[in-house]
Amino acid sequence: MEMLLGTDIIEVDRIKRAIENGGRKFSEKVFTLNEIEYCESRKAGKYQSYAARFAAKEAVSKAFGTGIGKNAAFSEIEILKDSLGKPYVRLSGKAKEFYDSLGTAGISVSLSHCRAYAVAYAVISLGDSFKNKI
């Protein structure tokens, strides 16, 4: 089985400044309402949560091999948590169409942060049909 990998690291203060200076316009362009609700509920760690999700979106887009833009918008890559707290990705729009076209078998993400930085990794597992796409 082949895999596509993506990673990203970001300074938490960069996201904090973007949210404070760009307000809802920035937040709603980059994050879904579910993500905003979750991050805002994390009072003390809200900016770390936003930054980790931003990094995860970048990591997924890098695993796609295209980055944000042509095949995926930030708001089309949603980072959620399951009942155990494990992060997972929900795609929509162009991002989902592109993902489905790859012949994938799954996508996994891992997020982490400290006070100053957030990092994320994305792994897209490819099915046998991917070999026919190259």
UniProtKB/Swiss-Prot annotation:
GO biological process, one term: fatty acid biosynthetic process
Subcellular location, record wording: Cytoplasm
Keyword Lipid biosynthesis assigned: yes
Signal peptide: none
One Gene Ontology term, aspect cellular component: cytoplasm
GO MF entry, a single one: magnesium ion binding
Family annotation (HAMAP family): AcpS (MF_00101)
Family the entry assigns: Belongs to the P-Pant transferase superfamily. AcpS family.
Protein name: Holo-[acyl-carrier-protein] synthase
Species for this entry: Ruminiclostridium cellulolyticum (strain ATCC 35319 / DSM 5812 / JCM 6584 / H10)
